[in-house]
């Protein structure tokens, strides 16, 4: 299901990975992390990047995979900074000199995480909180098209005196749900993708 609410973190959703604004937010984060990586590369440092999502780690996870982050920390799963530090040191032995750690805002404490990793590894680490810049910018093609489709469907519902509905997408088709039902929907965390993200990194 894809629920057509403007939630950049894609917190409310079942099965699929999409709410309006999510694709735009992810692309914004990827662009900014790519720029931070350039700085990390020139200064041989670790960048701890905190991204939005409230208590959902979907933005952190997907952008972490897209950016080849060294490690991704999300509120859905426990984490161990000793393991993060160990991975940094192991990859440093292979010649890698820069590291990206993506932190979901549901975890927070990015400054403390950066200081802890620097103390454990001896690698200079800096925290960057992207904040509300993730909510701005021009929407991506996907956000524009899906928002138009769902908006059109919503107007049709209103024209037929049907209210208190949330428009979504099921198996590629536009559908609608009772608003209370939609509010109770939560998107399951993709643990397999999380495993992939922390196994392969650039």
Predicted regions located by residue number:
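Short beta-strand elements at the ligand-binding edges of bilobed clamshell
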Residues: 15-24, 138-144
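Accessory alpha-helical/coil subdomains and C-terminal extensions
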Residues: 20-124, 128
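Catalytic, metal-anchored helix/loop core of enzyme active sites in primary metabolism
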Residues: 116-120, 136-148, 155-159
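Short, small-residue-biased leader/transition segments that mark boundaries at the very start
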Residues: 1-3, 7-14
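A short pocket-lining beta-strand/turn micro-motif at the edge of beta-sheets
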Residues: 124-126, 162-165
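Phosphate-binding loop/pocket of nucleotide- and phosphate-handling active sites
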Residues: 165-202
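Short gly/pro/ser/thr-enriched loop/turn and capping motifs at secondary-structure boundaries
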Residues: 10-11, 79-81, 132-136
């Amino acid at each position: 299901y894809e629920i057509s609410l403007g939630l950049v973190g894609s917190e409310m959703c079942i099965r699929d990975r999409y709410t309006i604004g999510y694709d735009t937010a992810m692309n914004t984060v990827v662009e900014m992390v790519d720029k931070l990586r350039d700085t990390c590369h020139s200064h041989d440092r670790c960048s701890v990047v905190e991204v939005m999502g409230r208590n959902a780690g979907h933005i952190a996870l997907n952008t972490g995979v897209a950016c080849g982050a060294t490690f991704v920390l999300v509120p859905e799963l426990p984490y161990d900074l000793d393991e993060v530090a160990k991975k940094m040191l192991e990859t440093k032995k292979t010649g890698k000199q820069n590291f990206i750690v993506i932190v979901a805002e549901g975890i927070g404490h990015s400054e403390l995480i950066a200081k802890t990793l620097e103390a454990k590894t001896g690698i200079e680490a800096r925290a960057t909180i992207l904040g509300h810049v993730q909510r701005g910018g021009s929407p991506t093609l996907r956000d524009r098209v899906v928002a138009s489709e769902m908006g059109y469907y919503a107007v049709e519902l209103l024209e037929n005196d049907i209210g208190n509905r949330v428009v979504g997408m099921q198996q590629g088709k536009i559908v609608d749900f009772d608003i209370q039902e939609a509010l109770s929907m939560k998107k399951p965390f993709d643990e397999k993708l999380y495993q992939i993200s922390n196994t392969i990194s650039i």
